[in-house]
């Protein structure tokens, strides 16, 4: 009888443990997909998407027109004669995207001296862009691409509505000079400057 009692007790405990496990799982899911954590997960997923087939070097950069967060109208075709950095990033005010934007900010003086125009592109709207730019004193325009039209022209994949982190360097001739299909947010501005300097020297 004792054995039977123990067996019954053990069986009686199992549903309680199972129910507790379900409750714990639900709590974990609620935490993971909260407003604070879910964007970080989506950003990480966007960064981890497989490397796509991007525009080849020497290809004319696809033209586009966009209204930046600061009110200026950006038309790529009118920027010929300048170096243009078009960097796609997943989401405003997330860890990697903030590091990348602040890296451009911290190298802004040097970029300006080299005649480089910088544009950040993501799928958030200009309300989000303004808040992001103001919070971190970003001196360059952020472009809204809520429909993914600019991303599509540059073959940048969207994952969960967020752009993969990819950078295009467009030469003064309006053609693709270099592409970074994967980007380390820290030190990226220096990578771009290092790419521009030898190219500029050859042109001279």
Segments the model singles out, each with a brief description of its role:
Residues 141-145:
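Short acidic-hydrophobic, aromatic-tinged amphipathic segments that line or gate anion-handling sites
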Residues 76-98, 104:
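Short active-site neighborhood of thiol/selenol oxidoreductases, capturing the structured segment around
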Residues 60, 83, 162-164:
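Short, small/polar residue-rich loop motifs at catalytic or cofactor-binding pockets
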Residues 55-56, 64-84:
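A short beta-strand-turn-helix
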Residues 163-204:
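Thiol-/selenol-based redox modules, centered on thioredoxin-like
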Residues 2-63, 67, 202-204:
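N-terminal targeting signals for export/organelle localization
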Residues 93-136, 146-152:
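Structural microenvironment flanking redox-active thiols in thiol-disulfide oxidoreductases
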Residues 138-140, 158-168:
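Structural micro-motif
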